[in-house]
Amino acid sequence: MVRLSYVRFGVAWCIAIIIVSGFSNAASDNFYTPKNGWRSSSAGDILAWRSIDASGIKANVDLTVAYQILYRTSQNSPKNPQHSVTTILVPKNSVKNKLVVVGEAQDSNNANSVPSVGFVSGSRDSPNLVVDESLLVPYLQAGYIVTVPDSEGPLNAFTAGRSGGYQTLDSIRATLSFDKLSLNKNTTVAGFGYSGGGQAISWAAALQQSYAPEIHVAGWAFGGFIPNVTALVHHADSSRASGYAASAITGLVDAYPDLEKASKSLLTSDGQDMLDFVRSNPITEVVSKYANVDVLGSKFFKRDGGLFLSKAYRDVARQNMQGTSQNEVPHVPQYVYHAESDEVVPYNSALQTVQYWCRHGAKVEFVTYTDDKLNHNNTQVTGSQPVFTFIQRLLNGKKVSWDACSFVKENTGPSASSSAGGPHVVPIPTGGHHTQSGSAHGGHSSEHAASSTHAPAGTGHNTSGTGPHASSKPSPSLHPSTGATSPAPSSHRETSGGAAGFGARVASRRRAAPPRTMPAPPLMER
């Protein structure tokens, strides 16, 4: 069976052709099981490798070869050995010593939804891969070798972001040391991802300096990322995106033995059935089944909201919360984007995290998409072209134009893609599916509303937890005192033709007056 997915990337149409035949299964494929003694190897060591026929990508770009590497990595902590797989795509006339690592939005706890299975066997259980493959095409056409790790690892632990960071960084190590490629330890690396893939990339950015300082990273780009799992669960619960809340809970339970043990006394039989369903089905089925369901309620937990009262959960949530440690502030340039109207990952949690990073020396351009027609899904393609421009500039040795942090608002609407499924392909139930098409940030004018802001302590945007992005459910205390703020825009306007380093953007900007300090948000014991 051949499935076509059309995505407009700038002015060019990308056609992802997924050839489905003879489905592989990670659980039954011996390649995914390392040989005895693998735990004594070092992080990033290659345990096994194989050549593959990446049928979906080959239909769109001329690949010289594709490989998969089984490599040693870490789970939850550098002290806990783990293994994972990365898929390497080598285009014809590949550029030497430049590597792009991609955070694939698996967003699923299902073993057959991992990127490496989707590349080999098609995307039956990896619906997000349909679009993400399309978005790889410009990078491959530019000659960049691309590595796509299974960043959820063999536990398929969606939202276990810290592990995703380790597994992403170790996929880079393994790829750079692979002797079949024209790469070496001095290779320049850049990475991008969205949603769960954005979470893995953002954690790679946060952990790189302490965990893999030898990697020469030029910068990172990510959107729709998950810096606070509890905020996602509260935000998505009892909405049409409730399936993401169920998947987030399941991922943490599967990744942390103490939480898995505690869950047995917290879950009802329906709750255990919910986790089993999440593990056994692709995210499309999970989102459909649990749409508008209160997954935190008494049907699934023996005590309403009891999950958040568990010490085991609070400990795990803190370990996977970003914007809480000065030792985990990314030190290379970042391009981050998020839709204010994101119905899955609350906008404020992303904003608060970036503000924290900025107060501690990060270099970030944070783009807020303000059009209320944008959702979690279609924001991915809307932001894909500026992400490509950012990555390409960095790999070409060009510096970004911001010295500290820049907060920008754009009213760019969604591509004429599905408001239901969107370019990210997971259909949040709204009663229909649409063909993916339209402009991906290339055909609209945009309003930039805010500022080259250096974000000293106590500056930023409104994070008061009110408005359309705040959860209506009461939540336990969660975010540390970040001194969140709200800007007071002035009427001054400045016209810029790609001033933030993206020549493709021609837009109007207005500078914001110094933000005023607002009360710190609660720590969402998320």
UniProtKB/Swiss-Prot annotation:
Region Disordered: start-end pairs: 412-526
Residues linked to a glycan: 186, 228, 377, 462
Low complexity: compositionally biased ranges: 413-423, 430-457, 480-490
Protein EC: 3.1.1.-, 3.1.1.3
Alphabetized InterPro entries for the sequence: AB_hydrolase_fold (IPR029058), Lipase_secreted (IPR005152)
Induction (record text): Constitutively expressed regardless of pH conditions or exposure time.
Keyword set, alphabetical order: Glycoprotein, Hydrolase, Lipid degradation, Lipid metabolism, Secreted, Signal, Virulence
GO MF, any single term: triacylglycerol lipase activity
Localization per Swiss-Prot or TrEMBL: Secreted
Catalytic site: 195, 342, 376
GO BP field: lipid catabolic process
Primary site of residence: secreted
Biased composition (Pro residues): 516-526
SUPFAM superfamilies xrefs: alpha/beta-Hydrolases
Reaction(s) catalysed by this chain's protein: a triacylglycerol + H2O = a diacylglycerol + a fatty acid + H(+); a monoacylglycerol + H2O = glycerol + a fatty acid + H(+); a diacylglycerol + H2O = a monoacylglycerol + a fatty acid + H(+)
Signal peptide: 1-26
Family to which the UniProt record says this protein belongs: Belongs to the AB hydrolase superfamily. Lipase family. Class Lip subfamily.
Physiological role: Secreted lipase that hydrolyzes acylglycerol lipids such as triacylglycerols and consequently releases free fatty acid. Can hydrolyze 4-nitrophenyl palmitate to release 4-nitrophenol and palmitoic acid. Due to an absence of fatty acid synthase genes in Malassezia species, secretory lipases are essential for the yeast to generate free fatty acids from degradation of sebum and assimilate them as lipid sources for growth. Plays important roles not only in lipid metabolism but also in the immune response of host cells and pathogenesis.
Protein name: Secreted triacylglycerol lipase LIP4
Organism name: Malassezia furfur (Pityriasis versicolor infection agent)
Gene name per UniProt: LIP4
